[in-house]
A protein has these predicted regions:
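Short hydrophobic helices that act as membrane-entry/anchoring signals
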Residues: 2-13
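Conserved beta-strand signature within the Rossmann-like core of class I S-adenosyl-L-methionine
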Residues: 134-143
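SAM cofactor-binding core of SAM-dependent methyltransferases
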Residues: 22-107, 116, 120-123, 143-146
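Rossmann-like AdoMet/SAM-dependent catalytic core
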Residues: 12, 16-48, 55-58, 101-104, ...
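Short SAM/SAH-binding signature in class I
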Residues: 109-115, 136
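Short, conserved loop/helix-junction motifs that constitute active-site signature segments
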Residues: 62-63, 129-133
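A short helix->loop->beta-strand "cap" motif at the edges of active sites that frequently abuts
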Residues: 66, 133-135, 186
């Protein structure tokens, strides 16, 4: 019934508004982590997030007091977000690659939170944008890559569904993300309870190999362990970080 309900635009948006009224967030405890880290770092009240769903995105908990920029290439999700989210959130429909990121630099004078979850070129986008010096970085890591220091190869038309490997070939490992952030003065500050999302600040001190967590959702729907997931993708092309 709910699936049918979501196919009808007015009903879907009414449903979304009802969820927003109750409070929305990320897949796990991302919202609580970001609120805590933003307070601890004295972050400017601005966020930029790309790769989002209208009622499920990491920075949703910040909407009440932050100005935000949300970016995605899905036209339906963009239209829904514009219809249901508050006016302090700017919403842009764009397919991003390494050559068209400059508008992000111009969004705010200072960025409090930068959140990246695009199921593909996450590492390469973060590498390109680290010089904007956000107070807090939230980025998806791929737990199927275990404690290896690797990323998928940059592909401007990256489509996780078309890459194979049961959708487990995307992004970069937590160790690789941590190395990249460390080179710019950031340390690992938190990992979400459900796995997959990592948070970096200038004062983070966690060891990525011990802080790593598997994806609870991935294990649940696939019935596999992270080691089995790695066996599925290990022969695909990688960049060692």
């Amino acid at each position: 019934m709910l699936r049918l309900f979501k196919k009808v635009t007015p009903l879907r948006r009414m449903y979304y508004r009802s969820l927003i009224a109750k409070g929305i967030g990320g897949q796990s405890d991302e919202g609580q982590i970001l609120l805590r880290l933003a307070k601890e770092t004295g972050a400017p009240k601005t966020f930029i997030e790309f790769g989002f769903h209208p009622i499920q995105f990491n920075c949703a908990a910040l909407m009440g007091s932050f100005k935000g920029l949300l970016i995605d290439a899905n036209s339906q999700q963009i239209a829904d977000a514009r219809a249901v989210l508050p006016s302090n959130i700017r919403i842009e429909e764009r397919f991003l690659d390494l050559e068209n990121l400059n508008f992000i630099r111009q969004a705010f004078p200072k960025v409090g939170v930068l959140s990246i979850d695009i199921d593909g070129n996450d590492y390469w986008f973060l590498e390109k944008l680290l010089d904007i010096q956000p107070s807090v970085i939230s980025i998806e890591y791929n737990p199927s890559f275990l404690d290896l220091s690797i990323s998928t190869v940059y592909d401007p038309s990256f489509d996780r569904a078309k890459k194979g490997g049961r959708g487990w070939y995307h992004g970069a490992s937590l160790v690789a993300m941590s190395k990249l952030c460390a080179a710019h003065g950031y340390g690992l500050a938190a990992v979400s309870e459900g796995g997959v999302n990592a948070f970096f600040t200038k004062t983070g001190k966690l060891d990525p190999k011990t802080a790593w967590r598997p994806s609870e959702l991935r294990a649940k729907w696939s019935g596999t362990t992270p080691q089995q997931q790695w066996e599925t993708v290990k022969d695909m092309p990688f960049v060692e970080i």
